[in-house]
Amino acid sequence: MSLEHWNLCLQRLQSEFSTSQFNTWIRPLQAEMLPNGELCLSAPNRFVLDWVSNKYQTRIKELLSEFAGDDLAPALKLAVKAQNFAQANQMSPPPPPVSSEPAINPLNNEVARESGYRPGFGLMDDEEGSPNADLEFEAPLTLSGTGLRGELEPYEQGQLPLTAPKRKVQVEGGINHGANLNNSFTFDNFIEGKSNQLAHAAALQVAENPGGAYNPLFIYGGVGLGKTHLMQAVGTEMMRHNPNAKVVYLHSERFVADMVKALQLNAINDFKRYYRSVDALLIDDIQFFAGKDRTQEEFFHTFNALLEGGQQMILTCDRYPKEIQGLEDRLKSRFGWGLTVAIEPPELETRVAILMRKADESGIKLSYDSAFFIAQKIRSNVRELEGALKRVIANSHFTGRAITPDFVRESLKDLLALQDKLVNIDNIQRIVAEYYKIKISDLLSKRRSRSVARPRQVAMSLAKELTNHSLPEIGDAFGGRDHTTALHAIRKIKELQDTDSDIREDYKQLMRILTT
């Protein structure tokens, strides 16, 4: 057996697993041949090791036997990869001493320019929705024997209040100003489903054992799927267990703004001490660091310091770390040292459960049929789902009418009309044809080759799920086919989604494109 057999095994596993499964469990494995002829697969942590051992080891051995020869029993060993921080730090320059940072003129500083600094305009443009609009800083920080503490005397020239800044706007549910956490984001009100099951389990483990094997925890997925909720739930749980824990949550833009402010005031040493003294650092939307070289340099050393100190980090992003353009490879590599998990758009059952929970929290009686109707129509993300529910509740409150499926349809009629306008059979055919790199005329033709028939079946299934057209109408729209052909296509795609990872991923991607 050789590493070539493992490479063949990787190719097969990538075709069998969904993208998120492969990226989470298989891609992080590092293979090497041991002197005794064993193939050793090293996992980045115990969590991945246990999962691969329990779920995938049998399949891996089957494939190795297939590629190495049926008569050769695969000699396979699974282990946890040892993290040698000394070696890791040799890969790149070590962090400079805290006292060696020179003063930098922000007008000539690349980071200041990247962050939007302009003379006379403050750190960043305070546009509506900007994470830096209406910022307040708490009392300036000084060093004490137990870390940073707030002082009440006025700021001195050149002194920077390096706590995470907070908004003047109060978030519903209350904010813990010490950690900048929204206390309404908890594990108790997070709805678990197939789409977020792994991320939820990993977050619970981190909350119970911060700084352990799953450090950093990297959560990625689209907008409005619950990444921030889950990350803040960990922070809230950590502070519930230890009220004195120094947990800091912030958006990545805030980290950049704090650093630029520190450079302006010649207080970069205080900045370093603060961010390296926390017990847990939670940073949202890490993709904002892309293209900001000075920020990445500083965060790289902060990352190393926290990891070596056993301090927990949780990062969120809108994409897999390897796919972040403009981010240094050394950071991408380190993001994978812990556990990387995906959150997918919620499936129908989870969407219904979310609506029922939100209605209950609002003291509103929502029937299953009404929740099902909303969940069937709003598929893109949790944020839009909640927005639709709030609209229905408000309409019910103002009119005094009970919430029924008909009332829901009436309340959301303009939203549904817009959705129907955007998602119609013509658009579905166009998007599917572009996705599979075929012509729309191929979908309407009598051709039955798999390269055309399968995309046609996918398009028919999407048309049934995303539009209100009947089976005869769908069949007719695809080259004058009858309703039995459309029904067969829908059933076939549903069956393939359970057995074919490629079809399952294609369908998810197309659904995301059509509903976002």
UniProtKB/Swiss-Prot annotation:
In this chain, the stretch annotated as Domain II covers 72-179
InterPro entries in alphabetical order: AAA+_ATPase (IPR003593), Chromosome_initiator_DnaA (IPR001957), Chromosome_initiator_DnaA-like (IPR020591), DnaA_C (IPR013159), DnaA_dom (IPR013317), DnaA_N_dom (IPR024633), DnaA_N_sf (IPR038454), P-loop_NTPase (IPR027417)
Q: Where does ATP bind?
A: G224, G226, K227, T228
**Where's it found, cell-wise?**
Cytoplasm
Subunit info? Oligomerizes as a right-handed, spiral filament on DNA at oriC.
Record-linked HAMAP family: DnaA_bact
The name on file for this protein is: Chromosomal replication initiator protein DnaA
Gene behind the chain: dnaA
